[in-house]
Each structure stands twice: as C-alpha cells, then as structure tokens.
Amino acid sequence: MPKSRIRKKADYTPPPSKQATSIKLTSRGWVAPVMLAMFVIGLAWIVVFYVTDGSLPIDSLGNWNIVVGFGFIAAGFGVSTQWK
C-alpha cells in the first residue's frame, strides 16, 4: 500500500495589526441641560400637584396632572438617548 504524502504546513503569518481609530464622541451641547430640565420640571409638576392637593398646576386636569409630570420625565429619558 502506498504511503500518503505529508502536506507541508504553511508558515504562520500573524494577522495585520489594527490601528486604533479614535471615535469622535461629540455630544450636542443642548442635550444635558434639556434632559435635566425635563426631569426637574416633571418632578416639580408632580410635587406641586401633591402639595397643593390638586389645585395647582392645572386644576381642570385633576389627576391627569400626574400623567403630565411623568410625561415630562419620560421626555427627559427620550432626550437622554441623544447623549454621547
């Protein structure tokens, strides 16, 4: 029975080195102030509603004032997704 040939192994060549590329993380200047303002406005809206027993900020909304306050807070979280 004939012997099979041994295949010559290819010489090891290391992969080319990757150069680190700097990523520009340019955050928009307006994002952080708007985000914090939305959080504070939402929190203040809810606190004022509870402290005044529902007569402020908008009396005709009634308990929907809580939804408005949480809406401001949710908008703050929405704006926070733009922060880099």
Swiss-Prot record:
Pfam families, A to Z: CrgA
Knockout-associated phenotype: Disruption causes precocious erection of aerial hyphae and early antibiotic production on glucose-containing solid media.
Keyword annotations: Cell cycle, Cell division, Cell membrane, Membrane, Transmembrane, Transmembrane helix
BP term (GO), one: cell division
Gene name as annotated: crgA
Origin species: Streptomyces coelicolor (strain ATCC BAA-471 / A3(2) / M145)
Gene Ontology cellular-component terms listed: plasma membrane
Cytoplasmic side stretches: 1-30, 82-84
Protein name stated in the entry: Cell division protein CrgA
InterPro entries: CrgA
Superkingdom, natural source: Bacteria
